[in-house]
């Protein structure tokens, strides 16, 4: 039996956020003999999942994101749609922008996915994820989220998964009435 490999798809949480988003911080205080850390961050800090409320839609209840995944390069999306896996539930799109993570140039990189949104929606996915700060403009977010497909942004290590099937597991924080959440995402190969 082949040994499974776990690939971490989430960036370390740190104060690297989209301009004008809430900054994040960790402050550790001593409380008697114990130390207690206080976390401050926006819902879209680091690798995160967007919920429908992000674009003003009614939120569904919290749930983990898991299922059969496949990763394709943004440049190969058109060919992918012609022959995608039948059991696909999670589509990850590799842009290679994650190599700029932690650098201001990261927020200057954008993808133009507008022409692919209808095809993404037609796949009836649980989620679509990207290794860049945003999958697209407000219209792209609204179309995808209103189709009950969650969006995962700021992922890493997608080059390891390119053109491969895997099991995907994403664990957001269980917070009531929120527009998104940092997510711990992994792939099992």
Model-identified regions with their sequence ranges:
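Active-/binding-site microenvironments in catalytic and ligand-binding cores
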Residues: 1-189
